[in-house]
Amino acid sequence: MFQLRRLQYEDVEWIFDACQDETIQRWTLIPRPYSFEDAAWFIENEPEYVTMVIEDSESSMPLGLVSIHDIDEITREAPMGYWIAPWGRGMKAASAAVKLLIATITPDENIHSVIAYIAEENTASRRTIERAGFVEVEREWGMAREFLNEVMAIKYRKTL
């Protein structure tokens, strides 16, 4: 089982370690190279609407992050993202965390739906978001990155 909690400064070390992973660097927009200072800045400034640490509920071991990036005031769509550290993969932590995050933000009259743009080639993340109840709504070029290069993205939506 999994739980979510707010970021704490003590998370800086494991976030730094996790973000050295090639898979995280491949599919996210983190700086490259990723420094300890980058991790500290992210925690201190928390640039997202909400960011939560995904933890194993028995051991409290941090496994990854899940976040709502912002809220579009016109469409009331809330783009989200997530990543799982190498030591947390294969446990379905991300799909559980997506469901937990949606339960945490609901009800919020400012959010009509949560969306995720996932690179077409990122099959693991596509399975994750589908397990969390999202449905494919369209495909757009350039809304996702692979090693910072624009690629075809699939837009997924879950209406609240």
Model-derived regions, located:
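Acyl-donor (CoA/ACP) binding surface of acyl/acetyltransferases
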Residues: 1-21, 55-160
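An amphipathic alpha-helix signature
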Residues: 9-16, 36, 40, 44
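Residue-level detector of secondary-structure transition/capping positions
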Residues: 23, 32, 47-48, 133, ...
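Conserved GNAT-fold acetyl-CoA-binding loop/helix
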Residues: 23-42
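Juxtamembrane/interface motifs at transmembrane-helix termini
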Residues: 34-38, 46-47, 84-85
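A generic membrane alpha-helix/interface feature
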Residues: 38-41, 47, 128, 151
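A short helix-loop-beta-strand connector motif used in the catalytic cores of GNAT acetyltransferases and
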Residues: 43-53, 64
